[in-house]
Design a protein with these regions (language model features):
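Residue-level signature of catalytic and energy-coupling elements of molecular machines
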Residues: 26, 33, 85, 103, ...
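A conserved acidic beta->alpha catalytic loop
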Residues: 46-56, 74, 104
Length: 263
């Protein structure tokens, strides 16, 4: 397969990189992606960054026909940026989309591992920090405990087997995103990642985890906030209650209400 046809065994791949004030990072991350997997394309989805990230991305796109830019009107959140990117990818005929942070916390050099898992039969691949071979660097202990504890709670509440449902480095076949109606996802932050994994899992797709190395950003400001964690906790709790209610109704021979799965 030639570079123009995409990554071997997966087809055309688009790496979506949402940005908001990532002027210090965008050149480096796009360069690393291009070096790691030259056959993939990159979409920078910029939320009208006041630091000029969008303009830098335009310069990169002008000099590299594998880089594209989606300019959005303002800061609408991570989930909305990815949903817009997914729609762009579908319109352009891509077979696979990859989620990747702009700050370098997700190593582009590990991207072949995610794509190879798709080639080997997975429908969706979660880059995972908490399996053998995975690791986290430069996180304070309280952050690591919150992440670990949150993932344990997600497994208990939703019954998903995944060790790391909140991670943001992952790859999906476009057919999966079409089937789970990704356009109706309203979550942001970590809960957005949980919801996508939950929908894919509930719809019977083969979702696998591969180990990744997560390194906290060295440049720029983190977008993490307490509200993101609170949203995740609330939504996961509601989804878990609804899932158990639907299981009970099924056992009683009653049909769960349509449209009640996602708050």
């Amino acid at each position: 397969m030639s570079e123009a046809e995409g990554y071997p065994g997966t087809g055309r791949v688009l790496v979506i990189i949402p940005t908001y004030n990532e002027a210090e990072n965008i050149r480096l991350i796009t360069d690393r992606v291009r070096r790691a997997v030259p056959s993939v394309d990159i979409l920078v989805a910029d939320d009208n960054s006041p630091d000029g990230t969008g303009g830098i991305a335009d310069e990169l796109a002008a000099s590299d026909n594998h880089i594209f830019v989606l300019h959005r009107s303002g800061k609408e959140g991570l989930g909305a940026a990815y949903v817009a990117g997914f729609g762009w990818a579908k319109d352009k005929g891509y077979d696979v989309v990859v989620e990747m942070d702009a700050d370098g916390s997700h190593a582009p050099e590990e991207l072949p591992n995610l794509l190879d898992a798709l080639r080997d039969g997975a429908d969706a691949v979660l880059g995972t920090r908490y399996v053998p071979g995975g690791s986290v660097h430069n996180w304070p202990m309280h952050r690591l405990l919150l992440s670990r504890g949150g993932n344990i709670y997600i497994r208990m509440a939703l019954g998903m087997p995944f060790k790391d449902a909140t991670g943001g480095y992952r790859a999906y076949r476009m057919s999966v995103l079409d089937a789970i109606d990704v356009g109706t996802v309203a979550s942001q932050g970590y809960s957005f990642q949980v919801e996508l994994a939950w929908r894919a899992y509930k719809n019977g797709f083969r979702v696998v985890e591969v180990p990744i190395t997560f390194t906290e950003r060295e440049r720029g400001a983190s977008k993490m906030s307490g509200n993101i964690f609170k949203e995740q906790l609330l939504r996961v709790t509601v989804w878990g209650v609804q899932a158990r209610r639907d299981m009970l109704l099924n056992r009683l021979g009653r049909r769960p209400r349509q449209g009640s799965t996602w708050p």
